[in-house]
C-alpha cells in the first residue's frame, strides 16, 4: 500500500510539471492575440496622410473607444463594425460597399465614407431617427439618387458629410437640427434661395470646390452661421446679404469683381475675410467696403487693385500681394496721423506689386507703429 501511494504521487507530480511546461508560454500567445486585435484609438481618422482629401474632418465622440472589441451584437450588419463599448456607433467605411446597409435603431453615429455608394434610398434611415452624425463623404452619390425625404425625418441630425461625391444640386429638405453641412468637392452649380430654408441652427457650411455661379439670398436666414466657405467656385457676385453671426467668410478663387458699399455692416462679428484670386478692381469697391471695426484679417491678394483700399484701424493682418498697386497712401490706414491715432496693423503684404519701399511716406512709421512685418 505504501509503494502504491508513492507511485501515485510521482505520477501526479509529472503530470503537473508537464502541464506547467505547456502553459509556461501562455503569455506569448496572449501577446500575439493582442497584437492582432489591438485598435489604436489615436489613428488619424477618417482622413489619413495617404488620403487624397486635404480637408480634415473633426473626429466625433464615436471614435473614443480603445479596448479590443468583444464579439459584435447580432443586430449589426455583417458588413460593418459595431463596438459594444460604444453601442451607438456603426463603422462601415472603406469596405467597397455599393449600397447602404440596415441601420439599427440605437445608432447615433454612422460612418459610410470612402465606399462606392451611389444612392441614398428613401427610408434607409427611418429605423434610426435618433441619428446625430452621418458620414457619407468619398462615395459616388448623385443628386437624382437621393430620396426626397431621406434626411428630413432625422430631427436630431447635427452633422452631415456629403463632400467628395457627384452631387449637382443642393440636397433637401434638411432637418432644422443640422449644425454642420459638408457639400464641398461636388459639382453643384447654384444654391436656390430656398435651398437652406429653416436651417436656423446651422453654424458651418462648406461649399468650396464646386461649380457654383450664384447663391442669391440663400444665406440670409442662417442666423447662427459662423463659417461660410464658398471658395474655389465660379461666383461673380458676393452673396446677397450675410448672416449676422458670421465670423469667417472664404470667397477666394472665384470671379468676384465687385463688393457693395458697407457690405459687411450686417455682420458685426465678422473676423476673417478671404477674397484672394478674384477679379476685384478699385472701381468695384466703395470707400467704406472694408471699413468694418470687427475685421482682424483681410486677404485681397492676387486681384487687379491699383490702390490700397481704405481699411479700419482695428485690422491686424492685410494681404495685398500680387496686385497692381503703384502708390502707398497712408490715408488708407489712418485718416489722421498723430500720437493718439494709429493703426493696429501687424502684418502688411505688398510684395508683387508696382511699388517700391522708397514710396512709403515719412509718416508711415507713426501710423503703422505696431506693424511687425511690412513686405514690399
From Swiss-Prot:
Keywords: Disulfide bond, Extracellular matrix, Glycoprotein, Leucine-rich repeat, Proteoglycan, Pyrrolidone carboxylic acid, Repeat, Secreted, Signal, Sulfation
This protein's record includes keyword Disulfide bond: yes
Cleavable signal peptide: 1-18
Cystine residue pairs: 334-367
Modified residues (Sulfotyrosine): 20, 38, 53, 55, 63, 65
Chain ranges of the LRRNT domain: 67-105
One example of a Gene Ontology biological process annotation: skin development
PTM note: Binds keratan sulfate chains.
Primary localization: secreted
Residues annotated with Pyrrolidone carboxylic acid modification: 19
Listed GO CC annotations: extracellular region; extracellular space
Quaternary data: Binds to type I and type II collagen.
Name by which UniProt lists this protein: Fibromodulin
Amino acid at each position: 500500500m505504501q509503494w502504491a501511494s508513492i507511485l501515485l504521487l510521482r505520477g501526479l507530480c509529472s503530470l503537473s510539471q508537464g502541464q506547467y511546461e505547456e502553459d509556461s508560454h501562455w503569455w506569448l500567445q496572449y501577446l500575439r492575440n493582442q497584437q492582432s486585435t489591438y485598435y489604436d484609438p489615436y489613428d488619424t481618422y477618417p482622413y489619413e496622410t495617404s488620403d487624397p482629401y486635404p480637408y480634415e474632418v473633426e473626429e466625433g465622440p464615436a471614435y473614443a473607444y480603445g479596448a479590443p472589441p468583444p464579439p459584435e451584437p447580432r443586430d449589426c450588419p455583417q458588413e460593418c463594425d459595431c463596438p459594444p463599448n460604444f453601442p451607438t456607433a456603426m463603422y462601415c467605411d472603406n469596405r467597397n460597399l455599393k449600397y447602404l446597409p440596415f441601420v439599427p435603431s440605437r445608432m447615433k453615429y454612422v460612418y459610410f465614407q470612402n465606399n462606392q455608394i451611389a444612392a441614398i434610398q428613401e427610408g434607409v434611415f427611418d429605423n434610426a431617427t435618433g441619428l446625430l452624425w452621418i458620414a457619407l463623404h468619398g462615395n459616388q452619390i448623385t443628386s437624382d439618387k437621393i430620396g426626397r425625404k431621406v434626411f428630413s425625418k432625422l430631427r436630431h441630425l447635427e452633422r452631415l458629410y456629403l463632400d467628395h461625391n457627384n452631387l449637382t444640386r443642393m440636397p433637401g429638405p434638411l432637418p432644422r437640427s443640422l449644425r454642420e453641412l459638408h457639400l464641398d468637392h461636388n459639382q453643384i452649380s447654384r444654391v436656390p434661395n430656398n435651398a437652406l430654408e429653416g436651417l436656423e441652427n446651422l453654424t458651418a457650411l462648406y461649399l468650396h470646390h464646386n461649380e457654383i455661379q450664384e447663391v442669391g439670398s440663400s444665406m440670409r436666414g442662417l442666423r447662427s452661421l459662423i463659417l461660410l466657405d464658398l471658395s474655389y467656385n465660379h461666383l461673380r457676385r458676393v452673396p446677397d446679404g450675410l448672416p449676422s453671426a458670421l465670423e469667417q467668410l472664404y470667397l477666394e478663387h472665384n470671379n468676384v469683381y465687385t463688393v457693395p458699399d458697407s457690405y459687411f455692416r450686417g455682420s458685426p462679428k465678422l473676423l476673417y475675410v478671404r477674397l484672394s484670386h478674384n477679379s476685384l478692381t478699385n472701381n468695384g469697391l466703395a470707400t467704406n467696403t472694408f471699413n468694418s471695426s470687427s475685421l482682424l484679417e483681410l486677404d485681397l491678394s492676387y486681384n487687379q487693385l491699383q490702390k490700397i483700399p481704405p481699411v479700419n484701424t482695428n485690422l491686424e493682418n492685410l494681404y495685398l500681394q500680387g496686385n497692381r498697386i503703384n502708390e502707398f497712401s497712408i490715408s488708407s490706414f489712418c485718416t489722421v496721423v498723430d500720437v493718439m491715432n494709429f493703426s493696429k496693423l501687424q502684418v502688411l503684404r505688398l510684395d508683387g506689386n508696382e511699388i517700391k519701399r522708397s514710396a512709403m511716406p515719412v509718416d508711415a512709421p507713426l501710423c503703422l507703429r505696431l506693424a511687425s512685418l511690412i513686405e514690399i
